[in-house]
From Swiss-Prot:
Catalyzes the reaction from prephytoene diphosphate to phytoene. It comes from Oncidium hybrid cultivar. Expressed in roots, leaves, flower buds, sepals, petals, lips and lip crests. The gene is PSY. Signal peptide: none annotated. This is Phytoene synthase, chloroplastic. One of its GO terms (biological process) is carotenoid biosynthetic process.
Length: 412
């Protein structure tokens, strides 16, 4: 997952029809912090920082829309989709519970200026690396806009660990230290100014740590895994590195006050957009990934199409490859369709950047087709002209809120 490709989904269950901030537990972690000054402006990270982990949320029961998997010894195993859906349900329940228990934020005197400086820096980074999305965030309320910037920057920094200039030096222990630092951040002990912006965000909104930890798990997977036996394995990877972004954003962006959508359905739509984006990344970057020795395509589906890793590394576009790619693109589009249903349920200010993101990313699939499925030597991209056309289209569609049919997780 290239850092420059991080595309945020902006679904939210947060506060319906209002701009009041949810505030953390009664002891208000931020008010307990010592006054500190942060001067760390770089995206890259010092990992000499650790803390104590937190316990996972208690399991909840809810109908599951995925199939079970039988392992080689005949035992029934839980599919990746079901595991991810369990996380979705926990996040939805957490939002509902925490919104019922919101309290009044008590900022400590002297911290406002430092936090404004930290958030401004996050906005600058977002503007530099995700210009279209950044413009869309300017329509949001200041509190939501700043929170999304903070989440974006944390995700980008995390992605840089395994995809940036220092990626070859990153070890599992470095990711362990990054996760420990995340836990400190959620406990109100930020290490630098960029951490401070996210630490403040999780005080102001009911953002849970689990999706952040899951993204780090995706980075661990990238260090040790370069093949995926089937779509079940690939689905879990896509959730870790991209679906999590949707779950992080859900408590922040805001739902239309007239929406009848359930919390779970909005989370599902957010998850679907993350999965769709990552599948699109994978299909676009086949050639780039093979040069790194990686194949992010289901091995069993390659075999069914009469293809092998050798064919991928040879990089020749054949009829077998075209047919294989048609099925992969069809799957990605199905996830985009599910995601689009949920965007209609966002409040108007939050719909535009998310819808623009979806329209632009979905066009990458069109470009792969236009390149005759040659994603070995050609990198599909959306031209500036098409991007400029998509932005007003997204804005116009964001003004309309059709009624939503509750989406379910889709796994072709």
């Amino acid at each position: 997952m290239a850092a420059s490709q991080l595309c945020f989904v902006g679904f939210l269950e947060g506060i319906r029809g209002g701009d009041r901030l949810w505030n953390a537990k009664n002891d208000c972690r931020f008010s307990q912090r010592k006054k500190m000054r942060w001067s760390f402006y770089c995206l890259f990270t010092n990992f000499n920082y650790a803390c104590v982990s937190q316990e996972p949320e208690k399991d909840l029961k809810f109908p599951i829309y995925s199939s079970l998997v039988v392992n080689p010894v005949g035992e029934v195993a839980i599919s990746s989709e079901q595991k991810v859906y369990d996380v979705v349900l926990k996040q939805a329940a957490l939002v509902e519970q925490q919104l019922r228990n919101r309290t009044v934020l008590e900022e400590k005197t002297g911290t406002t200026f430092l936090l404004n400086e930290a958030y401004d820096r996050c906005g600058q980074i977002c503007e530099e690396y995700a210009k279209t999305f950044y413009l869309g965030t300017l329509l949001m309320t200041p509190e939501r806009r700043r929170a999304i910037w903070a989440i974006y920057v944390w995700c980008r920094r995390t992605d840089e660990l395994v995809d940036g200039p220092n990626a070859s030096h990153i070890t599992p222990s470095a990711l362990d230290r990054w996760e420990a630092r995340l836990e400190d951040l959620f406990a109100g002990r930020p290490y630098d100014m960029l951490d401070a912006s996210l630490s403040d965000t999780v005080v102001n909104f009911p953002v849970d740590i689990q999706p952040f930890k899951d993204m780090i798990e995706g980075m661990r997977m990238d260090l040790k895994k370069s093949r995926y036996k089937n779509f079940d394995e690939l689905y879990l990877y896509c959730y870790y590195v991209a679906g999590t972004v949707g779950l992080m954003s859900v408590p922040v962006m805001g739902i239309d006050p007239e929406s009848d959508a359930t919390t779970e359905s909005v989370y599902n739509a957010a998850l679907s957009l993350g999965i769709a984006n990552q599948l699109t990344n994978i299909l676009r970057d086949v050639g780039e990934d093979t040069r790194r020795g990686r194949v992010y395509l289901p091995q069993d589906e390659l075999a069914e199409a009469g293809l092998s890793d050798e064919d991928i590394f040879n990089g020749k576009v054949t009829d077998r490859w075209r047919n294989f790619m048609k099925n992969q693109i069809k799957r990605a589009r199905t996830f985009f369709q599910e995601a689009e249903k949920g965007i209609a349920e966002l409040n108007q200010a939050s719909r535009w950047p998310v819808l623009a993101s979806l329209l632009l990313y979905r066009q990458i699939l069109d470009e792969i087709e236009a390149n005759d499925y040659n994603n070995f030597t050609k990198r599909a991209y959306v031209s500036k002209a098409k991007k400029l056309m998509a932005v007003p289209v997204a804005y116009g569609r964001s003004l309309i809120r059709p009624s939503m049919k509750k989406p379910s997780l889709v796994k072709p």
